[in-house]
């Protein structure tokens, strides 16, 4: 989630649901009838409505791909097939930006988690974030692919060095199994920089502990 702009380029995927502007409070119940559960955020960038197109194309591709995953893959096989998907969508977004002047340098970040065959994985490209709240303590799980994170605090925090499309020459996807088992009571939160640029990690922690809702975080970001 993130603060909504007039032209909102963020998009959310929750299994088979796509959301952009609506406020949402959702509970996902895993009834073990489905092999895969997926939640992701893409934060698009580019002129005109190019960012909206990039984030939408990426998440629709991811949803279609996740629904078609074969059962019983090993961790190595799952990681390999996810990387193949990433390479394909990166080429698609980059090509669309090259052949259409109005979509020049269109791109998007991507962050999400996938529950596949009893295992939890997280993925990240860019500076959208995955956090975990456990026992009242907030931890950033993902790593920002930003100039500041790569070269130090003297660099701007809002310049990313990795994205899907966007003319990026070395696009890559972090895809990892969770190191710690997911525990009862854990809260996992995805957000674009539209949230964490407006509110500190400590304030995010306080809001999650106190209220535990997306709407409370959005209100805190606006105040």
Question: Residue ranges of each PLM-predicted region?
Answer:
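PP2C/PPM-type serine/threonine phosphatase catalytic domain
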Residues: 1-223
